[in-house]
Amino acid sequence: QAEDGIRDAQESRGLGDVYKRQIEKELSIRPPLVFAEEARRLRKRMADVAEGKAFLLQGGDCAESFAEHNANNIRDSFRVLLQMAVVLTFGSALPVIKIGRLAGQYSKPRSSPFEVINDVSLPSYRGDMVNDMAFEDKAREPNPERLLQVYDKSASTLNLLRAFAGGGMADLTKLHEWNLEFVSGTNEAIKYKELASQITSSLEFMNACGMTPENTAQLRETEFYTSHEGLLLNYEEALTRKDTITEEKGWFATSAHMLWVGDRTRSIDEAHIEYMRGIANPIGLKCGPSTDPDDLLRLIEKLNPLNQAGRLTLIARMGSADVYKKLKPLITAVKKSGLIVGWCCDPMHGNTVKASSGFKTRKMDDIMAEVRGFFEVHNEMHTVPGGVHFEMTGQNVTECVGGVYEVNEANLADRYHTHCDPRLNATQSLELAFLVADLLAENRTNLAKKIVAVS
């Protein structure tokens, strides 16, 4: 558990009521949401990501909400992630590790403890795990019962995701059925349909050779993992369990397979770092433009003292204008140190702007520019661009502007449903997947040329 004396900037801002002891006790006796062996398996998969043997796709809601928690939304997000993974697999010729920002992403750090509208000041909305989005006194009061609601909704989401992953929805013979209705007819849907036809032809050949979904599990099932920011530590600690089954005994967070530390809570004296240091799950660390290379090395050594591949993934969120200038010194320092990490690109959080209409939005051009910059730096440094981390949804929202099926600022109000930051819709998500696939294919070609040149 996190030491009491360690500074915890995000949790000390008037949220004491959230952590009432009876709620913690109730959570501590509830069954784990995930199991140690699942987290251990993901750690092995993340080792492959760090070594360039697999590629990470991490995506889902900025902040899940109780209002949007239903089977259709979960299914549609899962389906878009499956489509993106197929596109990335085709481009990279690598296994794609699929991790959702799902089943627990109900809290958000805020830069200000208060929100002011028309001279009225109320506590900031911190996600449905803490309080309600409605701008009213009672709604903004922290409510400890919400922790139990998050547990229940996360459990039902995980149950559904496991059913989807192993119950036939991931069957590769159903590739053509994954397209969402509102995506049909777009350029991305046409490109996806062409790719699906190529894969179907390959499957027909494999079927003729005796490999079918009935006798080959990999053709009908997929591994799917969950993750969220480990922000509210009393929730995380109450769901931390000791693994007593295997020889590799240790403490595991059982609220998700993977947790990450946000850019606002990554100071080395934060309670969040102390908590993450003590769990055996694979973990992520967000790195923003203010990240100092020496501080980063100290954090890596604290979070991964045994220097194990798969333990720690650095999630870079620099902004399109700064990605090359800010990311290169970090990669240089880590490479020189010999420390083993995975590298992942979050092109969302550094590119949030306010539209003239007042809506927060993100521009597809900026998002794509940061992804390109991420790959450019890694190609130059001969390091591994290990993954991408998107905020997206399977819903037909209008929250990010741009893309081939263009959403402009005038459209933002049409279907702006996010409870926090703007998300990519399914069409925009597929467009980005095709971009990343092209970059991965180019990276593969460059690597092959280097190997030939050396030999």
Residue ranges and their predicted role:
Residues 2-19:
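Short, small-residue-biased leader/transition segments that mark boundaries at the very start
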Residues 296-305, 311-343, 349-398:
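Non-transmembrane, aqueous-exposed alpha-helical and coiled segments at domain scale
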Residues 1, 10, 274-275, 380:
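Structural motif
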Residues 57-59, 97-99, 343-345, 390:
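General beta-strand structural signal in soluble alpha/beta enzymes
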Residues 2, 268-269, 323, 327:
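Amphipathic coiled-coil/heptad-repeat helices and related helical stalk/stem segments
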Residues 20-75:
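N-terminal "leader" segments that precede or initiate the main folded domain
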Residues 64, 68-319, 362, 370, ...:
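Active-site-facing alpha/beta catalytic cores
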Residues 51, 286, 455:
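Ligand/cofactor-recognition surfaces for anionic moieties
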